[in-house]
Regions:
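Glycine-rich phosphate-binding loop of ATP-dependent small-molecule kinases
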Residues: 1-144
Length: 144
């Protein structure tokens, strides 16, 4: 079983959190996810670290649950929407002498992903959807 770190799961445990206000809790949950990620890199014996990359509602979590649930590794369930953030995470993984692996999850139909995004319990602005999809693709090109 992998050790999964997800800002979305952390968000649910924050005081006064409600899905309608998800965007307001995102910065804090992402900060806590980064902190948990750093701790896992230091303390967890797994040698592989998977970074998920893809925009909001792209299917990353579903991919994780169906395809990665038997892996023995650390998994960061995030959008990887900035090159700076990706670079920092990759440097930390390498410094911990672990192997970084990036799985990019890109929806076959952006319109369908947007409809899924609009119908989620967790509410974010439309700009967040476009920012994470464009940013994750830019990051993927930067990494490769």
């Amino acid at each position: 079983m992998p050790l999964v770190i997800s800002a979305d799961e952390i968000k649910k445990k924050l005081p006064n959190y409600s899905p309608e206000k998800a965007e307001f809790f995102h910065r804090e949950s992402a900060r806590l996810a980064d902190k948990n990620f750093e701790k896992a890199l230091k303390e967890n014996p797994f040698k592989e670290v998977i970074l998920l990359c893809g925009g909001t509602a792209s299917g990353k979590t579903e991919f994780l649950v169906t395809q990665l649930n038997r892996k023995h590794c650390i998994i960061l369930d995030a959008t990887l929407s900035t090159e700076e953030g990706a670079g920092i995470k990759l440097k930390k993984i390498l410094k911990a002498k672990k192997k970084p692996i990036i799985y990019a999850v890109i929806p076959d139909d952006l319109k369908r992903a947007f409809i899924a995004f609009l119908n989620r319990d967790r509410k974010f602005s439309d700009a967040h959807f476009y920012m994470t999809h464009a940013g994750s693709r830019r990051t993927l090109l930067w990494v490769t």
